[in-house]
Regions:
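Active-site environment of non-heme Fe oxygenases that use a 2-His-1-carboxylate facial triad
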Residues: 1-10, 16-18, 42-216
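Glycine-rich, aromatic-bearing surface loops/beta-hairpins
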Residues: 25, 39-42
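Short secondary-structure junctions
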Residues: 32-38
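N-terminal functional module of multi-domain proteins
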Residues: 9, 26-32
Length: 216
């Protein structure tokens, strides 16, 4: 697993002997310090496609509901985004929703593009803890990118969004098709992920269920 994370930024395997949540926590503990996505919540978070009225306010689920999710890194609204994401499939559902990955290192970005991404300023909204930040920085190893919580503050940041939108369109996407008990680990400082559209977008009864543990 560690070799795969180092080489390509992600690893996929299967649950072995433990129950799914225990195995996710065991992997997370091997990688660093597990941490809950929201204060006073369980370390293991259940992720299901849902309508806005059932989702956390301002989350991607609230904004995009049952449709596809844009590419992003998790916890972009934290001062330092989590290092790893450990996900497991409790149920793949019947609508063939895939997780899509893009390796930041594979993006076709020239020096001019990188300079814009380093200098364009975004407002990162997190209630009273909101702050300003760029997408990348010479001082940090991580990417900060999530249009669900990052807002352009001027022409430069709008150009930065266009640069990445173009790079994403041209990039190679890795499709993760889920089966029960699959486990996926992502280097959240390198791999952006999104969610594909449902094969039945009108369905409100999709039982797909992923469990997630974040690692500092």
């Amino acid at each position: 697993m560690l070799d795969s994370l180092q080489e390509r930024g992600w690893w996929k395997g299967q649950r072995l002997e433990l129950n799914l949540d225990d195995e996710l926590c065991q992997i997370a503990n091997c990688l660093g310090q597990p941490i809950g996505a929201r204060r006073r919540r369980s370390i293991v978070e259940v992720l299901k496609p849902m309508s806005a009225d059932l989702a956390y306010a301002n989350s991607l689920s609230a904004q995009y509901q049952l449709s596809s999710f844009p590419f992003h890194v998790d916890t972009a609204h934290w001062p330092t985004p989590c290092k790893y994401i450990v996900m497991g499939c409790k149920s793949p559902g019947s609508c063939d929703r895939k997780t899509l990955l893009i390796d930041w290192k594979s993006l076709q970005l020239d020096d001019s593009d990188m300079n814009v991404l380093k200098n364009a300023v975004f407002l990162v909204k997190d209630g009273a803890r909101s702050f300003y930040s760029s997408i990348i920085s010479d001082n940090n190893d991580f990417i900060r990118y999530d249009i669900g919580c990052m807002y352009a503050t001027g022409p430069d940041s709008k150009i930065a969004l266009k640069i990445l939108s173009s790079a994403f369109r041209k990039s190679v996407k890795i499709e993760i098709k889920w089966e029960e008990d699959d486990i996926l680990v992502l280097d959240n400082w390198r791999i952006l992920h999104g969610r594909s559209r449902s094969s039945d977008p009108m369905s409100m009864n999709e039982p797909r269920e992923l469990h997630r543990v974040l690692v500092k």
